[in-house]
Amino acid sequence: MALETCFRAWATLHAPQPPSSGGSRDRLLLSGAGSSQSKPRLSVASPSPLRPASRFACQCSNVVDEVVVADEKNWDSMVLGSEAPVLVEFWAPWCGPCRMIAPVIDELAKEYVGKIKCCKVNTDDSPNIATNYGIRSIPTVLMFKNGEKKESVIGAVPKTTLATIIDKYVSS
């Protein structure tokens, strides 16, 4: 199942905590996570009556861990306007090597979730994008950062080759 949201929670205490011999701490409980019938719920268990309830600040953001289709309609917003680095695969349904590299791109999207975006452009459906970037062979993978093309790789390359490129732009 694709991860659709990233949830971070942290507690900010307002009162000093009395010393405790039992080492009790607030516990964050996530229930219903394994059940397909109920939505996960977040609750706080505060075992110490001397300790006031913590105030929780939550930050949720949509994070996509799968490869998203980019086309001529959404290219500017998805790739050129992205704050995160973007890995773009140019492919076609009839291309054998494209079918070989697709699972590699899927794995990278999951491994780098929240750090990069992964997109794919069908060159048959969006020939103008391919022409603008000089795509003459497929699969071709381009790396974009701040709306600029930074690197390109042609052919069905190993995962480590693409991961090395991604690491350059994620850490910079």
Curated annotation (Swiss-Prot):
Would the keyword Plastid be found if you checked this record's keyword annotation? yes
Tissues and organs where the protein is expressed, per its UniProt entry? Expressed in leaves and at lower levels in flowers.
- In Gene Ontology terms, what is a biological process of this protein? plastid organization
Q: What happens when the gene is disrupted?
A: Semi-dwarf plants with pale-green leaves, abnormal chloroplasts, reduced carotenoid and chlorophyll content and increased hydrogen peroxide levels.
- Record-marked site positions (Contributes to redox potential value): 96-97
GO MF entries: protein-disulfide reductase activity
Q: Name one GO cellular component term.
A: chloroplast
**Family annotation (CDD domains):** TRX_family (cd02947)
Specify the inducers.
By de-etiolation.
**Stretches for region Disordered:** 17-47
Q: Where is the transit peptide?
A: 1-59
Q: Please name the PROSITE patterns in this protein's record.
A: THIOREDOXIN_1 (PS00194), THIOREDOXIN_2 (PS51352)
User: Where is the catalytic site?
Assistant: 95, 98
Cystine connections: 95-98
Task: Tell me which domain of life the UniProt entry assigns to the organism this sequence originates from.
Answer: Eukaryota
**Entry keywords, A to Z:** Chloroplast, Disulfide bond, Electron transport, Plastid, Redox-active center, Transit peptide, Transport
**Locations listed in the record:** Plastid, Chloroplast
The UniProt family comment states: Belongs to the thioredoxin family. Plant M-type subfamily.
Q: What does this protein do?
A: Thiol-disulfide oxidoreductase probably involved in the redox regulation of chloroplastic enzymes. Required for chloroplast biogenesis and differentiation. Functions as an electron donor for plastidial 2-Cys peroxiredoxins and participates in hydrogen peroxide scavenging system in chloroplasts. Possesses reducing activity towards insulin disulfide bonds.
Put simply, this protein is called Thioredoxin M5, chloroplastic
Which species? Oryza sativa subsp. japonica
